[in-house]
Amino acid sequence: MKYLKFTTALVTIAFFSCSQNEAITTNSPDKNIKVDVTLSEKGALTYKITHKNSEVIKTSKLGFDLEGIPSLKENFEIINTTNSSFNETWQMPWGEQLDVVNNYNELKVELQETSALKRKLNIVFRVYNDGVGFRYEFPEQENLSEVLITEEHTEFNLTGDHKVWWIPGDWDIYEHLYNTTKLSEIDALQFANHENLAQTYIPNNAVNTPVTMKTESGLHISFHEASLVDYSGMTLQVDTENNALKSVLVGSENTSYKVKQTAPFNTPWRTIQIAENAGELIESNLIVNLNEPNKLGDVSWFKPTKYTGIWWEMHLGKSSWDMASGKHGATTENTKAFIDFSAKNNIGAVLVEGWNTGWEHWIGFEDREGVFDFVTPYPDYDLEEVVRYGKEKGVEIVMHHETSAATETYEKQQDTAYALMQSLGIHSVKTGYVGKILPKGEYHHGQYMVNHYNNTIIKAANYQVAINAHEPIKATGLRRTYPNTISREGLRGQEFNAWASDGGNPPEHLPIVAFTRMLAGPIDYTPGIFDIKFDKWKKDNQVNTTIAQQLALYVVIYSPVQMAADLIENYEGNPALQFINDVGVDWQETKVLNGEIGDFVTIARKERGSENWFVGGITDENARTIEIDFSFLDAETTYEAIIYEDGRDAHWDNNPTSLAIRKLEISNKSKETFKLAEGGGFAISLKRK
């Protein structure tokens, strides 16, 4: 596949001298967003951002504290500035769309201390039509070689007490419910302990990113980071009195610094997505565009796919991961049943969890190193036979590597484990990192684990293996650079509905996720639960949506690997299964048709390699009526639409399986009205006639 479609020439103008108090400016290509950079009287570098002449970020400072030497925050002079422009269209090997426009104006500001040390630091701003990214560059220099960062001081001073959708700044896990408050009302420390989380650490009143806000004027802004490599993850500490955020890097109990680097190096990009409506946030490509181009070349060995698997039954308690319980789920017989079902229903893969030895001692113990063996199956699971049988049926096995957060054990076995996969023709693995990180004192989002996750991706690519990571580092767009980074969890997923003591994910959860976590990248949410109440297995839990919303999630919550997560017996004979059979997983283009954060969202996606479109819409706990304008469809073309929608009496709690299915002809002149039940949704397949 040709990834680079066209690129305009880079045009650069350098200014080698400027007034130290004069604002240096760059704009977005459409001139709507402007960045002003200045030096304060104390020589601190500051920036501010405006959108259509209204401030978005007030004057905010930048800098670092370093271990054992003076900080890099003040006493700077500007020694050079460079403005440039760039415009290209590149192609995603898989993704929400094929063609991605990467068009920005760049400002590079080169600083040097006025003190005797004369240390240098550069700041690079890239301004797009959909937001701003900036990063620090530590150039090679005599007076600063090894860099030990104790804290990064990146400020985001806001213009008001915005409405915020946030989760706490947990150094270990992203599996919290989202909160909706004013910025001044954020209290992350109230979530410092949670009985359903295997690991959690919230040291500050901070939030994790992406964190999304809406101003009183209706502007939408979201803060995150891009290209997180060899650095610690960033949380944002909240100043509730002054309406401000400031970076707090994830640390380690094993070092007094948070980042160790050697110049020259760059930090991750700090990103601010800016949109006039909520849907534009989802359509933004700022995060992926700030990452380096594909370093792997041809990755056609990975095929986006739907999958079933031995997973949900463990969360329900029907079976278990280990053999000692007497209810082992990962048997040859059970796997073949899933292969047969998948082959009949246009589903390309089967995930098998609990196949390998070690599950009897995987969680709740300090001595977890050496527990898992990533090549040795349990006696009742014939790995070679299920792979052979799957190939016969056209179904690939998805490998599973739960590490129990014992990183050294996994690193020692990776070559052997990936070589086994390659020899069997298995091209994807779901990894897991449940529990506190070993070695002790490290956190899931610190530099140690950032490097572990990224090195795992690179090593796996050498064996043509793609990674779907659970308990991962946050997504920051590295799927562009390493497109074997296919999906990840990194949010409170479907499994919480099976056993969470708080009753699972409320109906507003996913209408928030679409505008927060999903801005970072693909989500392995595992939709498609048809037995919403599952009273046979659990009396106090359920999925808090209608079945129509479960179908809609295949379109709304993006991932190139989408699970049909329920038990086989809950699918068989159910006409709703046809949508899972039909729906695509790889997209030519994506359009957000409407949406408000935490309330509702409707997304349309066109399948690659066909002329078919699919539409999904979901709502929170409130019923609503939505009109869809189908003008996005091809002109002078008729489509056969199959609509799966909430029944008249549907309700996420009282009657979640009430579903109506109807067919009609649709064209780009059509408009249709859909009634969404409380916690409901609708899904549409549109096949060109």
Q: Regions from the language model: what does each represent?
A:
Residues 597-637, 682-685:
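Carbohydrate-binding surface patches
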Residues 136, 342, 467, 556, ...:
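Conserved, mostly hydrophobic/aromatic
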Residues 23-296, 658:
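N-terminal accessory beta-strand-rich subdomains and adjacent acidic, glycine-rich linkers
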Residues 109, 566-614, 651-655:
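Glycan-recognition and catalytic regions of carbohydrate-active enzymes
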